[in-house]
Amino acid sequence: DAIDGQEILMPVVSGADLWRESGRYDSVDVLVKFKGRSGADYVLNPTHEEVVVDYVKSVLETYRQMPFMVYQIQTKFRDELRARAGLIRTREFIMKDAYSFHETQSDLEQYYNRCHTAYERIFARCGLKNVVSVMSSTGDMGGSVAHEFQLVNDMGEDTLFLCDCGFN
């Protein structure tokens, strides 16, 4: 909340129409799809871009309301080919995700940096000293830039190359 976000809770299940409208219904491999009793198509939301865009269309009336950010901490479902990392990353997991809307690319980039710094402060308050930020793939969910915060330890399947220059 310190970075001007608003916590909300979005639905675990959404109608498939939102996903069809975005073009991702048939392109995202990890979607859990099912039919309701009436025969309607539904999706267990592995992420909420479709839902939040639909929501923002109804609440943002002018660009003057930007930047606008909502976030949630919620259970996610992804039908991944190979669930990994034991209990940390299975097909069902809890994730904090945030969605922000900006008038300019420059404002988006500045806000992204504010979010990144906020996470670093959270980890410091928790006493986590071995957390590093690494560039990562946007994966099935898409996007242009992504970072992951990883706790350096001997377990897990990722290999990190670290140097004193700060480029990880």
Regions found by a protein language model. Give the residues of each.
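TRNA-recognition modules of translation machinery and tRNA-sensing kinases, especially anticodon-binding
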Residues: 1-168
